């Protein structure tokens, strides 16, 4: 018997083992049946890595002391929102932000010892990961021409130094607002009258922490009209508005002074606030004079509204007849939804919301480093949905470029230009290569 024949069984076993391993890895990364297996493995990795970050890397003192100083003034009885301030300046966040950090102030053993707060933010970080995983999973339900969002998209969510820093080392309010917002997206995806009402409640609570949630509002208006009709849209907006009025009630009713109402809203929702040029991440390549100019602000607002209008008109109603048909049906039957849910894929809701936010990021007057959390968890979803121009290599290149810009501190002319180019490429990609209206053949396959 030859040596080759003796070794052939072992060789066959080795090839079989390699083939089995490759199949297992492929299933863990792409097979919907193994979505939560992979998500859980990544979750465990995030737990270990995050604990290591908290243990090994010092907390960064930026806004936490100012938050606590603002809380001190609130607890001391100050109810004029315009007078509440800390070492970094006046309080510019809505009331729920103040209440959350008041809870930290009350419940933590010491506001000087931030380690317990870091573990709370670790909880926020892990909850955000689970929430976004749920959004990806629900978006991948194979119905109405939709398709699976593979769990390989979750891997980039674990690779950002900036994201870990924002959540675990700096204790900003941005992650809290985004976690509540992601919970609202899940409620919208679950759907039904109760789901949309709960989603609007959660959306408003997120807005009550930070006004960046307004970036998602144009997309939400479109979705409310599509899924809930005119009456449902009015109901949803009423829920959001009522909560925004109830949250600051302690400031309104402490004294019979109408000025306090105006002081709250002009402080918590100050659209005219000037940003410091030294902290900008996305506009370093222009002069400070141009950065602070009113003309630039007006131009950016006009561009923002124009692109939102284009997406609303041509991209956000992926049904036969498009936006005109949706509008016609909505206004002719205001009590019912303006489109058939069976006509749109499961990813429609997060895609509209996330793309509206990305447009806001593109035209933002300034982005600071903590604003990275406003869209970081959405990027793999958007790139897979067309922002990567339908090409894996392009998607990876855009993601790496954007992350490099955020990881470089302080920002430079080149990193700001790269970030703006990355945002522009993603918005154009979504518009020209975004997921198209499912064809009749796709729908029949989905059934």
UniProtKB/Swiss-Prot annotation:
<dbReference type="InterPro" id="IPR007873">
    <property type="entry name" value="Glycosyltransferase_ALG3"/>
</dbReference>
<feature type="topological domain" description="Lumenal">
    <location>
        <begin position="254"/>
        <end position="296"/>
    </location>
</feature>
<feature type="transmembrane region" description="Helical">
    <location>
        <begin position="205"/>
        <end position="225"/>
    </location>
</feature>
<protein>
    <recommendedName>
        <fullName>Dol-P-Man:Man(5)GlcNAc(2)-PP-Dol alpha-1,3-mannosyltransferase</fullName>
        <ecNumber>2.4.1.258</ecNumber>
    </recommendedName>
</protein>
<feature type="topological domain" description="Cytoplasmic">
    <location>
        <begin position="56"/>
        <end position="83"/>
    </location>
</feature>
<keyword id="KW-1133">Transmembrane helix</keyword>
<keyword id="KW-0328">Glycosyltransferase</keyword>
<dbReference type="GO" id="GO:0005789">
    <property type="term" value="C:endoplasmic reticulum membrane"/>
</dbReference>
<feature type="transmembrane region" description="Helical">
    <location>
        <begin position="380"/>
        <end position="400"/>
    </location>
</feature>
<feature type="transmembrane region" description="Helical">
    <location>
        <begin position="35"/>
        <end position="55"/>
    </location>
</feature>
<comment type="similarity">
    <text>Belongs to the glycosyltransferase ALG3 family.</text>
</comment>
<comment type="function">
    <text>Dol-P-Man:Man(5)GlcNAc(2)-PP-Dol alpha-1,3-mannosyltransferase that operates in the biosynthetic pathway of dolichol-linked oligosaccharides, the glycan precursors employed in protein asparagine (N)-glycosylation. The assembly of dolichol-linked oligosaccharides begins on the cytosolic side of the endoplasmic reticulum membrane and finishes in its lumen. The sequential addition of sugars to dolichol pyrophosphate produces dolichol-linked oligosaccharides containing fourteen sugars, including two GlcNAcs, nine mannoses and three glucoses.</text>
</comment>
<keyword id="KW-0808">Transferase</keyword>
<feature type="topological domain" description="Lumenal">
    <location>
        <begin position="192"/>
        <end position="204"/>
    </location>
</feature>
<feature type="topological domain" description="Cytoplasmic">
    <location>
        <begin position="226"/>
        <end position="232"/>
    </location>
</feature>
<feature type="transmembrane region" description="Helical">
    <location>
        <begin position="84"/>
        <end position="104"/>
    </location>
</feature>
<comment type="pathway">
    <text>Protein modification; protein glycosylation.</text>
</comment>
<feature type="topological domain" description="Lumenal">
    <location>
        <begin position="433"/>
        <end position="447"/>
    </location>
</feature>
<feature type="transmembrane region" description="Helical">
    <location>
        <begin position="412"/>
        <end position="432"/>
    </location>
</feature>
<feature type="transmembrane region" description="Helical">
    <location>
        <begin position="171"/>
        <end position="191"/>
    </location>
</feature>
<keyword id="KW-0472">Membrane</keyword>
<dbReference type="GO" id="GO:0006486">
    <property type="term" value="P:protein glycosylation"/>
</dbReference>
<feature type="topological domain" description="Lumenal">
    <location>
        <begin position="105"/>
        <end position="118"/>
    </location>
</feature>
<dbReference type="GO" id="GO:0052925">
    <property type="term" value="F:dol-P-Man:Man(5)GlcNAc(2)-PP-Dol alpha-1,3-mannosyltransferase activity"/>
</dbReference>
<feature type="transmembrane region" description="Helical">
    <location>
        <begin position="119"/>
        <end position="139"/>
    </location>
</feature>
<keyword id="KW-0256">Endoplasmic reticulum</keyword>
<feature type="topological domain" description="Cytoplasmic">
    <location>
        <begin position="318"/>
        <end position="343"/>
    </location>
</feature>
<feature type="transmembrane region" description="Helical">
    <location>
        <begin position="233"/>
        <end position="253"/>
    </location>
</feature>
<feature type="topological domain" description="Lumenal">
    <location>
        <begin position="365"/>
        <end position="379"/>
    </location>
</feature>
<feature type="topological domain" description="Lumenal">
    <location>
        <begin position="1"/>
        <end position="34"/>
    </location>
</feature>
<feature type="topological domain" description="Cytoplasmic">
    <location>
        <begin position="140"/>
        <end position="170"/>
    </location>
</feature>
<feature type="topological domain" description="Cytoplasmic">
    <location>
        <begin position="401"/>
        <end position="411"/>
    </location>
</feature>
<dbReference type="Pfam" id="PF05208">
    <property type="entry name" value="ALG3"/>
</dbReference>
<feature type="transmembrane region" description="Helical">
    <location>
        <begin position="344"/>
        <end position="364"/>
    </location>
</feature>
<feature type="transmembrane region" description="Helical">
    <location>
        <begin position="297"/>
        <end position="317"/>
    </location>
</feature>
<keyword id="KW-0812">Transmembrane</keyword>
